[in-house]
Amino acid sequence: MTSRDFSPTGIRFENIEKRYGGLAALRRIRFEIAPGECVALAGRNGSGKTTLLRIAAGLVRPSSGELTFPSAVGAAAGPAPVASKTEPVRAKPSAGFVAHATMVYDELTAEENLLLFAKLQQTLSPTERVEKLLHEVGLFDRRDSLVRTFSRGMRQRVAIARALLHEPSILLLDEPSTGLDPQGVAWLAATLRQLRDAGCTILMSLHGESEISTLATRAIRLDAGLIVADTRSGAEVRSILTFADA
């Protein structure tokens, strides 16, 4: 997927809280992901996984706390402090995000979707980069087809390709295998493994054990917006991800 080496960047959550009215979606979230680490989030629906990922992506502003992106040498890279109510938190520009609900434009072709975002992100050599990704996600032969004609799995491939356009140093994924067939899951696992091995920092939410979950070297379980487990022990990581919804 990529021949580049990343400048490893971590993610630090400092006492992050998120409230929606009287509902606390996240409470006292404090942990750090090391540059180049691959971390899986587990927990029931509504436990706070998606909210945490959206905060990391800069799409949701926390009610309190601070989000920073330390580099491998310890300097803060792209700090994202809590902003005013009118100013959203800014995510690190090199982060890629894949949402649980595929965020693609139905009335555009697969190629048009990627070219649009490549130009918005000022991707170098956008046409060549888009063609390369379409080949790698197995959609080059369908590049001129409207996305509304695609299956859910094919739409997810477009969304994943979009997140990889600028070869991000941080990749955030919310249940990325949703709608993918076994071949698609195998492709995604191979892609994430290559990115991880190149130094990309990965934070992803997962439901159950799969080929993708085996990539995680750390698992964090959320329950009612709180971190209730955080381990790098191989056996415990597997246990948490095997019973991710328990």
Q: Predicted segment positions?
A:
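The feature captures the beta-strand-to-loop junction immediately N-terminal to the Walker
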Residues: 42-44
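Hydrophobic anchor residue at the start of the ABC signature
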Residues: 160
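Helix-to-loop junction immediately C-terminal to a conserved catalytic motif
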Residues: 57
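H-loop/switch region of ABC-family ATPase nucleotide-binding domains
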Residues: 206-207
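Catalytic Walker B motif of ABC-type/P-loop ATPase nucleotide-binding domains
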Residues: 171-174
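Conserved ABC ATPase "signature" region
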Residues: 115, 119, 125-142
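Conserved catalytic motifs of ABC-family nucleotide-binding domains
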Residues: 167
